[in-house]
Every structure is written in C-alpha cells, then in structure tokens.
Amino acid sequence: LFNGLVFMPFFLKDVKCGDIRYGRNYYDYQEGTLVFLAPGQVVGIVNNGEYFQPKGWALLFHPDLIRGTSLVREMKNYTFFSYESNEALHLSEQERKVILDCFHNIESELQHAIDKHSKTLIVNNIELFLNYCVRFYDRQFITRSHVNKDILTRFENLLNDYFQSEKPQIIGLPSVQYCADSLHLSPNYFGDLIKKETGNSAQEYIQAKLIGVA
C-alpha cells in the first residue's frame, strides 16, 4: 500500500501483475502503462488470491525537492495528475525506452556523491520526464481520435439537451465539472480533450454554444 500524503508518485508497470486500486476505482493498468497520482491519494494492489511478482518502476518525490525551482510554477500545466483511473498513459515501446532513460538518469544522479549540482540535475530530469509525458499524452489523444470524437458528439448532445430544457433558468450555465461528470470523465482530462479536438477550452465551447442558441 502506498500512501501519497506528501509524495508525488508515478508508476510504470513492466508486466501484468494485478490491478492497482485507487479509491473505489481500478486503473486501466496493463504492461507499459504509466500512472500518475496526486499527493494525498492512497493506492494499493488488488489481492485476488493469485500470486504475482510485481515488476516495474516507481518514482516518488517530496514536494520540498522542487520548492523554489521553476518546476513548481510548471506543475499546474501537468493536468494528468488529476485524471481518472481509466485515463492512464499507455506507452509505445519507443516511448517506454524514453521514460526509462529519464528514470535511469535520475537513479544515476541519486547514486552520485551529493554536490551543489545534485538538486538541479534531479529536478531537471523530473521536469524532462514530465514534458515527455505531455508529448506522449498528446500522441494518445491523437491515436484515440475516434474515441475523442465520440465524446465530443456526446458533449454536443449534452449541451443541446441542457439548453433545450429548463435547466438554464434553474441552474444557469453548465459548468465544466457538470459536463465532465455527465460524461464520466475527470474535469482535467475532459478539458484537455476538448482543447485538443476543437482548439477551444471546454468553457469557451460552452460559451459559444450559449451564444449559438441565444
């Protein structure tokens, strides 16, 4: 059991060895899957009676490590920390090698004698790793375009039904949270998906829809 009260955890699974439980949900967590967890979350391995020998990589770091660095300001851009359990990153073999290179660089630096450059180099490698993950998530959005377009259609239908009902008078403008919940997605994943598919934020899309039906 991993308790992430003060750590930023990432897990890269190398073999099929059971599922990770995150709250009440289970990660879509097969070989070559990369999982991100927000601080304060508790995860565990599901015990179904079978014996597994877990194999993979985990990177956990205390927020104090990046305090006072440029990475602190960038963390808000890594929206995948708030994705739902079924929105994990599935790596290609080449992407997996890139990620492992980042892990090996961090591991090598941790084994090096500590000097005035240690923190900078470790943090820079963590930031490089996160930036690669942004790229790979962009690729995943593209390769799952047919799924994304289905979500976009459902979003459009949701807005049509909403504005044709009495909800605007009773509730007001639908929020991004409301739409994401209705589509069974996390707000961050939903927002990123809409931005990549339309070029507009989910909030901008809702505003444009309101103008269109006015």
Please tell me what each predicted stretch does.
Residues 98-112, 154, 158-165, 213:
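Solvent-exposed, amphipathic alpha-helical segments
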Residues 1, 211-214:
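Short, intrinsically disordered, charge-balanced linker/junction segments flanking boundaries
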Residues 117-120, 124-131, 138-166, 170:
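Polybasic "coupling" helices that flank or enter modular domains
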Residues 95, 147-158, 175, 198, ...:
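N-terminal positioning helix adjacent to the helix-turn-helix/winged-helix DNA-binding module
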Residues 80-127, 132, 136:
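Amphipathic alpha-helical segments enriched in hydrophobic/aromatic residues interleaved with Lys/Arg
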Residues 173-212:
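Basic/polar phosphate-binding segments, predominantly the helix-turn-helix DNA-binding elements
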Residues 1-84, 115:
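N-terminal regulatory/effector-sensing and dimerization cores
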